[in-house]
Amino acid sequence: LFLFLFAIQTVITVSAQKVQTPDQVYGQLFKDVQLSRIFPDNKTFVDCTPKRKPAAIVADYLKIKNNPAIRFSLKLFVEENFTMPPAPPAFNYIQKEKDVAAHINNLWSVLKREKDKAVEGSSLLPLPHPYIVPGGRFREIYYWDSYFTMLGLKESGETATIKHMLDNFKFLIEKYGHIPNGN
């Protein structure tokens, strides 16, 4: 049994798609953006999508960043070459329920995200089924949080949503060889 499981894991790992991370794609540009703190957190730039081919953006960056004839602004360069991630949906859910269970049941629709669309150059790993995010400011699923989310969904009778989330995990394993912390 152990050898069989090992063989299956080996096949999954070998056939898994390799995806370059933003630091691999953007190299020095990524490092400079993250260290300059032009964004309030380290996640914003990771979630930006390029307006053109990443290799062209990096080549332009390396060419002009230290050019003394150009008054270079890293923030302006990023704004011109990347689309900022959309703001999370407004969390306008304020109702007085009679009990905590009713409140939680009503939050599922606020925290639910529909299946993702692939965007070239985005770090988002698109998921084929709807899922629940761990809170209002989040745009993606998180592996560890999903366990506790599914426990809550089970208590609420949301079995279809649990199935979608498990199908997303299956998809991630088949495509990437593992379930990353976030998609």
What are these regions (language model features)?
Residues 10-16:
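Compositionally biased non-globular segments, especially hydrophobic aliphatic-rich helices
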Residues 16-183:
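Acidic, mature catalytic/reactive cores of soluble proteins
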Residues 2-10:
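Bacterial N-terminal signal peptides
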